[in-house]
């Protein structure tokens, strides 16, 4: 069954959705977006991601991340030009953080003491207490992937174009404006809304349960492996600590912050100093023992994760008698690691509403 589809948004969620939809050669797909791979803008979260695959969902909601893991694993093994590589990941937990998360009702599976993903990662193991960073109570490690977003996003766009997807730049004030933007010259019967944080103010959506989860990072030339992710830090309420070395010379990401509701787009030098100081304390070899002065900074950056109070929104909505909307937004900090699983869900919904629309003709 063929559909005329306009995908609004060209971040990792929009492009992955377009790619999987394009596998049906009957679909006529147009991607429209204000920002494209190669752009660096605080509104465009995807380039600022680490990015990696560190499961965050509960086991009951884990299917999106499970499906995506196997696709990223395939890309490492078969498509090296995608900019994804295997990298060992070390997770460090503090009991105070995990207990707080449990009380809040929003536990992060990544820091669970009995994580569901221990059976997904073949070499998963709990660390011996002697391996755990001072100040943390327990840890685990496994081989995951790290993604060079500067390579991966253009690769993803190229795969879409290879499959016949047409890409346009546009700024939409209302989701309904996408009805006039199909390259096929006719009204699309389906619009995929993959605008991320843009859904907060996009007319026709205006989802006020959306908010930025501000992330500040430092990108350095220094190399360091394995990846490091911690459940929390002693100082700085919105501060977290992580490190990941991107594939193919993409630099090493030092983080960071997870500050829900903070719209500040400029890097804070005090936060930057805290980020770097923490990293050189737990991983002094990254700077050859020279402390912060031994870090070769490429840039300081801020990205806005598309946080949503009730989690990701993937559902269909009737716009009018001609067109349906399929929403795919609100992924917060796990857009990459849920991208393929969520896109598969989008394909299912597109098939569902496409059949429903045609049955009424």
From Swiss-Prot:
* UniProt: anthranilate 1 binding residues: 242, 305
Q: Is Transmembrane helix a UniProt keyword of this protein?
A: no
| Primary location | other
Query: What subcellular compartments does it reside in?
Result: Peroxisome matrix
GO annotations of cellular component type:
peroxisomal matrix; peroxisome
Similarity-based family: Belongs to the DAMOX/DASOX family.
Query: Which PANTHER family does its entry note?
Result: D-AMINO ACID OXIDASE (PTHR11530), D-AMINO ACID OXIDASE (AFU_ORTHOLOGUE AFUA_5G11290) (PTHR11530:SF16)
The protein, known as: D-amino-acid oxidase
């Amino acid at each position: 069954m063929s559909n005329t589809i306009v995908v609004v948004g060209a971040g990792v969620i929009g492009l992955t959705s377009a790619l999987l939809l394009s596998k049906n050669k009957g679909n006529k797909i147009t991607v429209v977006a204000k920002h494209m791979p190669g752009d660096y803008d605080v509104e465009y979260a995807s380039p600022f991601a680490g990015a990696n695959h560190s499961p965050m969902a509960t086991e009951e909601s884990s299917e999106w991340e499970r499906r995506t893991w196997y696709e990223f694993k395939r890309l490492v093994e078969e498509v090296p030009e995608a900019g994804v590589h295997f990298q060992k990941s070390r997770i460090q937990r503090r009991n105070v953080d995990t207990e707080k998360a449990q009380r809040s009702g929003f536990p992060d599976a990544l820091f669970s003491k009995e994580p569901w993903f221990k059976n997904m990662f073949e070499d998963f193991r709990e660390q011996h207490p002697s391996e755990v960073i001072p100040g943390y109570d327990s840890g685990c490690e496994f081989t995951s992937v790290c993604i060079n977003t500067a390579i991966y996003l253009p690769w993803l766009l190229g795969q879409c174009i290879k499959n016949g997807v047409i890409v346009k730049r546009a700024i939409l004030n209302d989701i309904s404006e996408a009805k006039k933007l199909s390259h096929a010259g006719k009204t699309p019967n389906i619009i995929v809304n993959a605008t991320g944080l843009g859904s907060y103010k996009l007319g026709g959506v205006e989802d006020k349960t959306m908010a930025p989860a501000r992330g500040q990072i430092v990108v350095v030339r220094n190399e360091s492996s394995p990846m490091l992710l911690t459940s929390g830090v002693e100082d700085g309420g919105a501060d977290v600590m992580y490190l990941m070395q991107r594939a193919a010379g993409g630099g090493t990401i030092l983080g960071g912050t997870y500050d829900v509701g903070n719209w500040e787009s400029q890097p804070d030098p005090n936060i930057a100093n805290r980020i770097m100081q923490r990293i050189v304390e737990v991983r002094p070899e990254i700077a050859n023992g020279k402390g912060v002065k031994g870090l070769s900074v490429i840039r300081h950056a801020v990205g806005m994760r598309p946080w949503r109070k009730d989690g990701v929104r993937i559902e269909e909505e009737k716009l009018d008698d001609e067109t349906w909307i399929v929403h795919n937004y609100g992924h917060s900090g796990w857009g990459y690691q849920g991208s393929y699983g969520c896109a598969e869900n989008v394909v299912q919904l597109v098939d569902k509403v496409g059949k429903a629309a045609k049955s009424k003709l």
